[in-house]
A protein has these predicted regions:
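Surface-exposed extracellular loop regions of Gram-negative outer-membrane beta-barrel proteins
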Residues: 3-27, 31-46, 104-107, 115-122, ...
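Acidic helix/loop microenvironments that form the catalytic cleft of cell-wall polysaccharide enzymes
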Residues: 17-21, 63-65, 182-184
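Outer-membrane beta-barrel and related beta-rich outer-membrane complex signature
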Residues: 25-29, 52, 65-77, 134-138, ...
């Protein structure tokens, strides 16, 4: 779904909506997922009188939700193949019927300015996004017939600024243009799975640290560890 509207060539509104049906959601209570976005921009240089030095001015803002599915077979796991023994074994992950897509909710605001007859231009943007419903595996009692269960939790936040400054002009048939950019991004693990509930035992989960792999050979290279309050690049 896409909707666009404008008012007097000064205000511009864009609204989108998308609904996906994913086969990975089979055997789950949620059969599809919807995610919208909305954006609004205003041409200040057309709405109000600005100083002569400013030839163009626009402000903009947007809010977006992007959804993505999880790995296959989490709602209906099949037999697992062991590449060492070349045998098939019963699934070890407890099947879940309430899986939800991972979602990233983001918003940004920006400003575009042009000066001195469009010779100089400035573009500034601030953004923030939060990624939710990440998939974690937690241990469960062997009496359940499985080794692990899936928990969806987590909150990883990204925020930053982007600045771009440009110059463009012509003299007697000779043109010159140059641009400079600056970006700054910071990410933070706001939450892992702590505070969630084990779907099998009903007990509260304590997970404020998670090992996600090695930067090379196992037990030799540095290890990447996620901790609540840390960043995605902590080692």
């Amino acid at each position: 779904m896409l909707f666009r509207s404008s008012w007097k060539n000064q205000l511009y509104l864009t609204v989108t909506g998308r609904n996906d049906w994913d086969s990975k959601l089979a055997f789950s209570k949620q059969k599809s997922f919807f995610y919208p976005s909305v954006g609004l921009s205003a041409l200040l240089s057309e709405m109000v009188k600005l100083p002569e030095v400013i030839s163009y001015a626009k402000i903009r803002g947007s809010y977006t939700v992007v959804a993505s599915s999880f790995d296959r077979f989490l709602t209906n796991p099949g037999y697992e193949y062991n590449s060492q023994t070349h045998n098939w074994a019963n699934p070890t992950v407890y099947p879940m019927d309430n899986m939800k897509p991972e979602k990233t909710k983001s918003w940004e605001i920006g400003l575009n300015l042009k000066f001195w007859g469009n010779r100089f231009n400035l573009d500034a943007t601030y953004y923030r996004s939060n990624t939710l419903n990440q998939t974690f595996k937690v241990d469960i009692p062997s009496s359940s017939g499985y080794k692990q269960a899936i928990v969806q939790a987590g909150n990883v936040q990204n925020q930053g600024i982007e600045l771009a400054l440009g110059f463009s002009d012509k003299w007697a048939g000779f043109g010159w243009s140059s641009n400079a950019t600056f970006t700054l991004n910071r990410n933070k693990v706001k939450r892992l799975a702590s505070g969630s509930v084990n779907p099998v035992t009903g007990e509260a989960i304590q997970m404020d640290e998670m090992n996600v792999g090695w930067l090379g050979k196992e037990n030799v290279a540095p290890r990447v560890i996620l901790t609540e309050g840390g960043s995605m690049t902590d080692i």
